[in-house]
Amino acid sequence: ILTAAVSGNSYGITSSQVMPQEFIAEQFKVLSEDFDIKAAKTGMLANDDVINVVADNYSPEHFGPLVVDPVIITKHGAMLLEQSAYELFRERIIPLATVITPNFYEAQKLTGIEMTTDEERVKAAHYLQDLGAKNVVIKGAHNDDSQTTVDDFVLLEDGDSFWLKKPFVKTDRLNGTGDSFSAIIAAELAKGNNVKIAVTKAKDAVYAAIANPLTVGHKFGPIN
């Protein structure tokens, strides 16, 4: 379901166009009438109008479990969600999430917690769960050249929690990391796997894609 389109290249996003509410709602309708959809994920929900139409039209009966990838801010600082829409996102989208997968910066924005320590990241995950997300993955940052691993914190619906750790790869080829991670989780849930298996497989696949980069573009290229 197309909610927005962007113009950009490896240097960054230059502009975006949000789809009309009626067009988004129509896509929900026609897809649910024809396909047996086993899982879904969100992407860029740019403003109040888009958030409302997605929340009004999504249902687990027609679209399966929902992976919420809160596309709020890119790794390079570009804002993709209007500031005025943060509270509505918390109220209407997060409670729909079977899994929510914010990156380090998005989790800071959604929770107001700095997360300078592991304990604060755990606190932020519980905060998001308190907002209604069943399972939470807070992805680690990739901006410290001294780091040796990238550590994601996972908090499951049953209270179980663990860290997913992979070696840090110093590279500018990271575009699509979060999109791919959430898409793989959705695909694994669609196959009937549980959340723990889904997030672990997603972490493994994204690490392999980062560790074997493609030389595409002149700046911040995509993962493989």
Region annotations inferred by a language model:
Residues 83-161:
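Conserved phosphate/ATP/ADP-binding segment of small-molecule kinases
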